[in-house]
Regions:
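Extracytoplasmic and endomembrane cell-envelope/extracellular-matrix remodeling and assembly machinery
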Residues: 1-2, 13, 25, 33, ...
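Catalytic Zn2+-binding segment of zinc metalloproteases
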Residues: 87, 97-114
Length: 438
């Protein structure tokens, strides 16, 4: 018998709290928007799902990805950078969607819920995450017995592969990529004879599993192209380059981008990645050169335009940044990454009304970056709207888990909001404990 929907929701929230203790959840509008667009596109083939799917990137070099209770799916930066094409990443996500839609984890977890959902969440996090963090997460004498029953069986893997294959075909993506990405994960054993990639510890693999996928691919050779798949595939090299440049070792990333450019001197993702690294190092002249080359080879890439605009902003050239961002927003007015950079440009120009307008708009597009609340607090303060400034600083600290500072700012906001019934109600609501998983 599987967990009830309510139980799985609670377990999912507890699980997410464990993940946040041990890992950095990537906060990047472009990366989060892209991974959720991909995930939601792939999940369209699932007819019934009791939970909204949410996709997260964890900053960690491990070759790992996993589905957690309550519809959350986590992908590690290390696995993203090992994939070369969208279909390889999609294959991993579709496999995890298969586990979710078949309720594999829910059925296994139900057997252990007698120990309490909070304790179970910790054990489950250790099982799925693996690696050095697992030992710290899994505690208590009951863990060992329960730990083994939480791993997926070979039958679970077979069913998830079959479902994942179906989702890949529905999305118009090559299901054969399931074999190529599994081969890459298998090769991850180079880390050492006693160190198996975390993904393989919870997802049994082997020649039989790969042969089954290969057979399915040969039996269903025809594949219909879909426009959204083509759009996502076109953006993928820039998504991967961003992950590699901003969230992996920069020296390794530089070598990778230079090798890519050596193979293809007109590699826009290669120059884009180098530009991001040099911007991080505050070498704006070199960053500008690389990003301008990327723009020359990919003039319609929103990612490259945003990268160049952010470099302009960082180097104090806000007017050029604003002009470039407005071009991006002409094509997609809800581009969160472009809006965030644009708001920062207006802040640096002391045009705080414009900055506030954009940041308030960004609050309507979850997940909301923590620094949206911080920056709103700054701009409201500059406008002498102090109750709103303290209110947003309160939210910033609440999201960071610092309830002492959060209460200080919420109380200050309450003092300054006498007579404003709507604002006082918002403050009272904000003073309630933070819902898990936000």
């Amino acid at each position: 018998m599987a967990l009830s929907i309510e139980e799985e929701t609670t377990l999912g929230d507890e699980f997410f709290a464990q993940v946040q203790k041990y890992f950095t959840v990537v906060e990047d509008d472009f990366l989060n928007d892209y991974i959720n667009r991909v995930g939601k596109y792939l999940s369209e083939a699932i007819e019934v799902n009791p939970f909204p799917f949410r996709f997260y990137i964890l900053k960690d070099g491990s070759l790992n990805a996993f589905a957690a209770p309550g519809g959350r799916i986590f992908i590690f930066t290390g696995l993203i950078t090992e994939t070369d094409r969208l279909p390889e990443l999609a294959a991993v996500i579709c496999h995890e969607l298969g586990h979710v839609s078949a309720r594999h984890l829910s059925a296994r977890v139900d057997q252990g819920k007698k120990i309490g959902l909070a304790t179970l969440a910790g054990i489950l996090a250790g099982v799925l995450i693996g690696g050095p963090a697992a030992g710290a997460i899994i505690t208590g004498t009951m863990a060992a017995g329960i730990q083994t029953q939480l791993h997926y069986s070979r039958n679970d893997e077979r069913e998830a592969d079959q479902l994942g294959f179906s989702y890949m075909r529905s999305a118009g993506l090559d299901p054969g990529s399931m074999v190529s990405v599994l081969s890459k994960i298998e090769r991850g054993r180079w880390m050492g004879t006693d160190k198996v990639p975390a993904y393989l510890l919870t997802h049994p693999t082997g020649p039989e599993r790969m042969a089954n996928i290969d057979t399915l691919t040969r039996e269903h050779p025809d594949l219909a192209q879909r426009e959204e798949a083509l759009r996502l595939a076109e953006e993928y090299p820039f998504f991967r380059a961003s992950v590699l440049a901003l969230h992996m070792d920069s020296s390794d990333a530089m070598r990778s981008f230079r090798a890519e450019i050596k193979k293809n001197p007109e590699s826009a993702p290669g120059y884009y990645g180098l530009g991001l690294i040099m911007k991080q190092r505050a070498d704006f002249a070199v960053a500008s050169e690389y990003l301008s080359r990327a723009m020359r080879y990919a003039p319609h890439s929103a990612a490259v335009s945003r990268g160049l605009a952010e470099m302009y902003q960082s180097s104090g050239n806000t007017e050029d940044a604003i002009a470039l961002l407005n071009k991006v927003l002409e094509k997609d007015r809800d581009d969160k990454a472009a809006l965030f950079i644009l708001a920062g440009c207006y802040q640096s120009k002391e045009e705080h009304e414009k900055a506030v307008s954009i940041y308030e708009r960004l609050k309507a597009f979850p997940p909301v970056r923590d620094d949206v609340f911080h920056n709103l607090g700054v701009s409201y303060g500059k406008l002498d709207r102090l109750s709103h400034a303290h209110f947003n600083f309160g939210f910033f600290f609440k999201k960071k888990g610092d309830m002492r500072m959060a209460r200080f700012h919420f109380e200050k906001a309450r003092e300054l909001s006498a007579g404003d019934k709507e604002m006082l109600e918002r403050i009272e609501k904000a003073l309630q404990p933070k819902p898990r998983g936000n």
